[in-house]
Amino acid sequence: KDDKYHYVSFAERFECGLTEMDVVLMRKDPPVDAQFIHDTQILSMAEAEGVLVVNRPQGLRDFNEKLAALLFPQCCPETLVSRNVTQFKEFIRLHGDVVAKPLDGMGGKSIFRIRQGDSNANVILETLTAGGALAMVQRYLPEISAGDKRILLVDGEPVPFALARIPQGDE
């Protein structure tokens, strides 16, 4: 606890009930599917029994990671979240160069760059919004070629270099 550079130590793997744990760290990559919901519901029960669950289960259920970023608009490019292809086309017309992505994706999967006049724009947008799914379109930032960085806070302090996703040459 007193060493600010070593937050945790790992013991050998063992099985126990959740309520036997002091702390549980919940971090799971998308998608948010039925299994994710069930996991967070079980963790909510452990939390109610006094287990410290880092990344509160209710918060994980309530906030999509991509949508949560929009709480800080000063840190985000212009963004449209919709299921309406016509609205997306107007956004592309306004900004000329955008990135379109599903709300439940991760790791750069199913992210598309669309420029005004792109002949694939319709099929990309229709695929992302299939079945009435919400999607996100953002103004393209050329600086992304240097990578994006995620900020991890521990006890309110940022941990340097927690996660950086740097596009590969063909991405």
Feature-to-residue mapping (PLM):
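Context-gated lysine
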Residues: K1-K4, K28, K66, K89, ...
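Conserved N-proximal alpha/beta basic substrate-recognition cap immediately N-terminal to
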Residues: K1-V81
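Pocket-edge structural micro-motifs
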Residues: A11, K28, N55, P102, ...
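Short, well-ordered, mixed-charge alpha-helical segments that flank or form enzyme active sites
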Residues: V32-Q35, L60-K66, L70, Q87-E90, ...
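Hydrophobic beta-strand scaffold residues
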Residues: V53, V98-V99
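Phosphate-binding site of ATP-dependent enzymes
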Residues: V85-T86, R93-D97, D104-E171
